[in-house]
């Protein structure tokens, strides 16, 4: 999950930028952060690391109003309603909320995939939890 560039879609970019028009210096910047391995160990740390990576990636774009010009989209893929997973999801969302409040960043949007489980006749397989942050700023 990286911003890619060129005809071969090489994952070399930290952020994606787009001009709003041809006549001004205004535009939009986006970046992505994820930390699936950290989320396996500690879901709260995984969500904070995802935010940290997204912010580190977008820092290469000028921000008119510093961090307050950034908005996040929180996306989580989680095997909810399985033993222990609802509390881990709550921990991740709470950590995200607290961290963003401390930084002065809003999270106006997001999406979830909470049915991350595959059922077979004699077995069930749950997917590992995954927290994915996308941030964007309009300059």
PLM features: what roles do these ranges have?
Residues 1-139:
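Glycine/proline-enriched, intrinsically flexible loops and inter-domain linkers
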């Amino acid at each position: 999950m990286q911003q890619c560039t060129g005809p071969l879609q090489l994952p070399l970019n930290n952020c994606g930028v787009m001009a709003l028009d041809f006549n001004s210096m205004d535009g939009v910047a986006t970046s992505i952060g994820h930390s699936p391995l950290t989320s396996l160990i500690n879901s709260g740390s995984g969500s904070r690391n995802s935010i940290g990576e997204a912010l580190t990636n977008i820092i290469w774009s000028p921000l008119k109003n510093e961090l307050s010009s950034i908005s996040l989209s929180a996306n989580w893929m989680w095997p909810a309603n399985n033993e222990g997973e609802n509390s881990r999801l709550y921990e991740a969302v709470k950590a995200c909320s607290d961290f963003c409040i401390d930084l002065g960043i809003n999270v106006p949007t997001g999406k979830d995939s909470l049915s991350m489980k595959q059922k077979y006749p004699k077995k069930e397989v749950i997917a590992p939890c995954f927290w994915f942050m996308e941030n964007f700023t309009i300059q």
